């Protein structure tokens, strides 16, 4: 069709007209998911044909979600809303132990590498701050993770956020280009789409203060445990140009 795919459209349309593009963009995104699903099926069938599927651990996760005008914006990288942070995480253990079991506890990106290393019988690196989400028997080990921290520094948008099972706090710089409120507090039980900002309500100030303190604790721990910078290397000018075009430099 004539509509640009989600992965390539931003350079052409920074702010698409939602009345014209919302449904086509969502459909394009769904098509990409279906395309990926077909190839994952082929991968799994290949593992089964080679006798590897039953003894293999598989972790499926997305790097981020996408905005489809949920909060008056598009694409990704500019906010810490749920549509960007809450992504699928599927773990298939050897012999499909605990297959079909859902875990409603908190899971964080920093936990993925320790989980995969643990399943392989290897220790996590000293610089890793996460922890295994489960063990080889399929037993969940993340029941006591109470909070998940996220931060964003992209295109002038500086944000920190903390999420518990029932609350979400997002802080942003006052002059952020995206134009989001500097403080946002959401009840994730009654308002999972994050449409009612509770930050200014007098009865919410105590929990707001507590969540701000938790964000500060996370920031302090990150600085205290930050590894030493690695060696710098020169990169090819062509590679640098490609990385700049993708927004990584």
Each PLM stretch: what is its role?
Residues 1-249:
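Catalytic domains that recognize anionic headgroups
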């Amino acid at each position: 069709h004539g509509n640009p795919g989600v992965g390539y459209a931003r350079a052409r349309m920074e702010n698409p007209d939602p009345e014209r593009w919302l449904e086509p963009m969502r459909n394009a995104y769904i098509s990409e998911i279906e395309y990926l699903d077909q190839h994952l099926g082929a991968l799994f069938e290949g593992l089964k044909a080679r006798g590897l599927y039953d003894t293999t651990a598989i972790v499926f996760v997305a790097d981020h979600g996408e905005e489809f005008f949920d909060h008056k914006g598009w694409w990704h990288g500019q906010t810490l809303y749920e549509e960007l942070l809450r992504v699928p995480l599927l773990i298939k253990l050897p012999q499909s132990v605990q297959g079909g079991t859902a875990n409603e506890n908190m899971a964080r990106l920093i936990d993925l590498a320790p989980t995969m290393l643990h399943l392989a019988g290897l220790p996590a690196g000293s610089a890793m701050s996460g922890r295994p989400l489960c063990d080889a028997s399929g037993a969940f080990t993340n029941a006591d993770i109470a909070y998940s921290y996220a931060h964003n520094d992209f295109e002038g948008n500086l944000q920190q956020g903390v999420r518990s099972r029932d609350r979400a706090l997002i802080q942003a710089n006052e002059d952020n280009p995206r134009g989001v409120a500097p403080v946002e507090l959401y009840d994730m039980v009654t308002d999972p789409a994050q449409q009612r900002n509770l930050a200014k309500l007098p009865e919410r100030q105590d929990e707001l203060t507590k969540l701000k303190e938790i964000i500060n604790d996370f920031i302090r721990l990150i600085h205290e445990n930050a590894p030493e910078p690695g060696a710098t290397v020169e990169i090819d000018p062509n590679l640098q140009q490609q990385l700049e075009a993708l927004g990584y430099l």
